[in-house]
Design a protein with these regions (language model features):
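Acyl-donor (CoA/ACP) binding surface of acyl/acetyltransferases
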Residues: 1-36, 69-169
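Conserved GNAT-fold acetyl-CoA-binding loop/helix
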Residues: 32-54
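A generic secondary-structure signal
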Residues: 54-55, 117
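A short helix-loop-beta-strand connector motif used in the catalytic cores of GNAT acetyltransferases and
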Residues: 55-67
Length: 169
């Protein structure tokens, strides 16, 4: 089980704990952050804490979406990581950061580290990224991280673009 994820020059990745609930709530109730996710934000800090407690991905699959922390301060600035999507039988890269960290290359730095982790540590052969067509910034992060367009799908009735990166053999 990989509770600790990759490290980069500026970032560490690890499983979120209940101590992160306030920041996790703030992230997932921010309308700018949630605009392109297709998710419903948290209504309370307790709901965020419950989501942290109830996350079975690390136990079930050995990996998940890690909290993403600045190395310099230890501050939770978002999350990034891998999630197995059983309905697609694919592993998806997802990330979400506070707006004050947008435009600094952090999402790309984190995405590249997570993809490398997927291929080296988990020995996956491909990873997908699902993104709403209007989320141009996220599409750019995926492209900078080596992903290529791989069609459109409609999980849960919502049209999304699928991007894919494959391991170099």
């Amino acid at each position: 089980m990989f509770l600790a994820g990759p490290e980069t020059e500026r970032l560490t990745h690890r499983a979120k704990t209940e101590a992160d609930a306030a920041a996790f709530y703030a992230l997932n109730s921010n309308s700018d952050v949630m605009k392109f996710t297709g998710d419903v934000g948290f209504e309370s800090e307790e709901q965020a804490a419950q989501a942290i407690r109830d996350n079975p991905d690390f136990e079930r699959y050995g990996f998940g979406r890690w909290g993403c922390y600045l190395k310099a301060t230890g501050q939770l600035i978002g999350f990034s990581g891998l999630k197995y999507l059983p309905e697609l039988d694919e592993v998806d890269l997802g990330y979400r950061f506070f707006p004050e960290f947008w435009g600094q290359g952090i999402a790309t730095e984190s995405a590249l580290a997570c993809v490398e982790f997927a291929f080296r540590s988990l020995e996956l052969t491909s990873v997908i990224g699902l993104v709403l067509p209007e989320n141009v910034a996220s599409i750019r992060v995926l492209e900078k991280s080596g992903f290529q367009a791989d069609g459109e799908i409609e999980p849960d009735g919502m049209r999304v673009l699928r991007f894919r990166v494959t391991a170099e053999v």
